[in-house]
From Swiss-Prot:
InterPro entries for the chain: Hfq, LSM_dom_sf, Sm
SUPFAM superfamilies: Sm-like ribonucleoproteins
Organism: Cupriavidus metallidurans (strain ATCC 43123 / DSM 2839 / NBRC 102507 / CH34) (Ralstonia metallidurans)
Subunit relationships: Homohexamer.
GO cellular component: cytosol
GO molecular-function terms, A-Z: RNA binding
Coiled-coil residue windows: none
Protein's recorded name: RNA-binding protein Hfq
Length: 79
């Protein structure tokens, strides 16, 4: 994955994680998962509800926060 993709993903997911914002994650097959983001890396998101699930990013279609989240994107490398 390119660094440009990480410029949006990482700050967004990190804000959701730090602020303990409940999220709905829709997978490409239509399944809806709900919980809080516990952790993430380049390939997976750990989603905590009654159990912790490892969700591969390539299977994720959409991440919908339960409320608005402010996050900062470092756009100094943008042209």
């Amino acid at each position: 994955m390119s660094n440009k993709g990480q410029l949006l993903q990482d700050p967004f997911l990190n804000a959701l994680r730090k602020e303990h914002v409940p999220v709905s994650i829709y997978l490409v097959n239509g399944i809806k998962l709900q919980g809080n983001i516990e952790s993430f890396d380049q390939y997976v998101v750990l989603l905590r509800n009654t159990v912790t699930q490892m969700v591969y990013k390539h299977a994720i279609s959409t991440v919908v926060p339960a409320r608005a989240v402010n996050f900062r994107v470092d756009d100094s490398s943008e042209s």
